[in-house]
Amino acid sequence: MWLQLLLLLLAPQGGHGCHGLELDRELVLAKVRALFLDALGPPPVTGEGGDPGVRRLHRRHAVGGFMRRGSEPEDQDVSQAILFPAAGASCGDEPDAGEAEEGLFTYVFQPSQHTRSRQVTSAQLWFHTGLDRQETAAANSSEPLLGLLVLTSGGPMPVPMSLGQAPPRWAVLHLATSAFPLLTHPVLALLLRCPLCSCSTRPEATPFLVAHTRAKPPSGGERARRSTPPLPWPWSPAALRLLQRPPEEPAAHADCHRAALNISFQELGWDRWIVHPPSFIFYYCHGGCGLSPPQDLPLPVPGVPPTPVQPLSLVPGAQPCCAALPGTMRPLHVRTTSDGGYSFKYEMVPNLLTQHCACI
């Protein structure tokens, strides 16, 4: 009696078995809800509708800062990055009046790893000139108003660009395609020449760089691997028998095994409470504990009675049950918010994911 009670206490709560052949999804979800509420407590309620706020955490936990939606094709994986200068020209730090009259402005940009790892499709530099349209037209009639250089190890080099439409007192410099590789460097130092422009320290006049990127196409080797047709099935008597075998009966998967179910927190109604991960694979034990012999045992010999195979049982005389082996459960780490996304908390749900199942 005491041994049976000890077994029940040691059996993990997340790996309950002894279910029939068909396990209802709602039953699994109800069990998962109970496990989460037991570990984390009830979700916070701050609004009338029971939601902890409307601010959501952007799904940017992938490498590079962005996560692509699984339903979007690869050619639709586009993004836009706005870069502000890490160090710009300061009107109070200019060495002499000659440089100020020359109208040379230096801006240093630091593209992120995400931007450098992608293919740039367009790039524009927005610069506040402080000139109205008439002054801009008069300056362009005599000589180019703006010039763009990049600082390299060999000295300043011109950057091919063209002027586009811009709001009043602003200029938009569209970088040519040949200049897109500049955004793949960790540091980008641009020299902008504008003799008629005045230096401004106002925050709203800060220049910025806009880059549109998309995922790089696969390399030649990877493309070749994707386009290579699969090898034909090698013919053999065993392969022929495998192809000609009848379909398996549902009872073939009725034995004790580890089952999996993809559960999203939106389905549980907790997507505004548990913000990461958005979903997880829930493993649990399922199936019966019949007396079918293992596949590695020898076939029965005619005239010799077969030896009955008993499942593993920790309690003699007890009915075996498909359950997780004690001590083999793994936790799930989640990120939660109680104020709508203004602060986050890392929490853990222990003994949730089943690793090994057995009839015990």
Curated annotation (Swiss-Prot):
The keyword Methyltransferase does not apply. It is found in: Secreted. This is Inhibin alpha chain. GO terms for cellular component: extracellular space; inhibin A complex; inhibin-betaglycan-ActRII complex. Inhibins and activins inhibit and activate, respectively, the secretion of follitropin by the pituitary gland. Inhibins/activins are involved in regulating a number of diverse functions such as hypothalamic and pituitary hormone secretion, gonadal hormone secretion, germ cell development and maturation, erythroid differentiation, insulin secretion, nerve cell survival, embryonic axial development or bone growth, depending on their subunit composition. Inhibins appear to oppose the functions of activins. The record marks R60, H61, R226, S227 as: Cleavage. Residues 18-60, 61-226 form a propeptide. It comes from Bos taurus (Bovine). Dimeric, linked by one or more disulfide bonds. Activin B is a dimer of alpha and beta-B. Inhibin A is a dimer of alpha and beta-A. Inhibin B is a dimer of alpha and beta-B. Interacts with TGFBR3L; this interaction regulates female fertility. Proteolytic processing yields a number of bioactive forms, consisting either solely of the mature alpha chain, of the most N-terminal propeptide linked through a disulfide bond to the mature alpha chain, or of the entire proprotein.
